[in-house]
Structures are given as C-alpha cells and as structure tokens.
C-alpha cells in the first residue's frame, strides 16, 4: 500500500493506538542489521525461516539465543505448525502451542469444508523475480504452498514433474 506496508498491519497498529512513526523497520536485503538488533537487546531472536548460514547464526548468537528451523528442516520448509511449536518451546508453553495448532487446524477444516471446489483443485504458488525477469513456482518442499495443500488442493502437475527435490522451479 502507500505506506510500504499492508492494510491489515496498518489496521493493527491503529487498533494498538500506534502509527508507522512509532515503529522501526529494518531492511534485510543485505542481511540482518546486526548493530541495530544488538541495540534492541532482545532476550531471544526467533528466526525459523530463511537462509540461516553458520556465519549469520554466529553473529546473531552473539546478540541473543537464536531459535531457528527444527533440525533437519531446510530453509523455507518450516510449516506453520512447526513455527508454532518452536514458539511454544521458546516461550515455555508447548501445551498452549499444541492447543493453538489443534484449534487452528479444526477451524481450517471447518472453513474449507464450505468450499468443496477446493478439494483436488490444482494450484501454482508462483513468484516473479523482477531483477532476473523470471517466473517461478514454489514446490511442495517449500512452506509457502502448504496452505493450499492444507485446503485440500494439489500442486499443478507441471510443478511436480519439473521440481524433483527443488524448492522452486522456473516456468517457461
């Protein structure tokens, strides 16, 4: 939107009695803003998504303990359920996390049951790289299309056939 934000984010700020002037946002294009993060003196850094190289992890760990993706789960492969589980562990409330996952899953099933046309419908979770001028699709290994499969949809055959173990595939 015109605030370089989203309408829902702006609405939540307003609900909290805040404005964009009350918050600080950091660009991540060149990696984490380590010095700025350190100034905030966080108790923990919650970073379950993204490209967490050993170098980035070390620098962040020098600032605060870092919660990353679960062991064995690649970057951008973390499901929303795993994010909630990691948050529950971090906060010392694993049972609350489990309850939230169960309640949300139930609500999703109830909501999607109203739309029988979703079951079995194919989808492509795509992206456009402006700099490279390429069009691609995230695969089932990536967390971004998981919402669609949670709704009962299936990955488009083209993506499945051309992706193998990749997280994304170029479309042509």
Which role does the model predict for each range below?
Residues 3, 44, 50-53, 72-75, ...:
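Solvent-exposed loop/turn segments at secondary-structure junctions
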Residues 63-131:
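Extracytoplasmic substrate-binding proteins
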Residues 37, 41-47, 65, 172:
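Proline-aspartate-enriched helix->loop->beta-strand connector
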Residues 26-33, 162-172:
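Short helix-initiation/N-cap motifs at beta->coil->alpha
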Residues 8, 32, 36, 55, ...:
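Extracytoplasmic/secreted proteins, especially bacterial periplasmic and envelope-associated proteins
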Residues 1-36:
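A short, structured surface patch at a secondary-structure boundary
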Residues 137-169:
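Alpha-helical, coiled-coil/dimerization segments enriched in small aliphatic residues
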Residues 26-28, 47, 69:
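Short beta-strand and adjacent tight-turn residues that come in two discontinuous sequence segments
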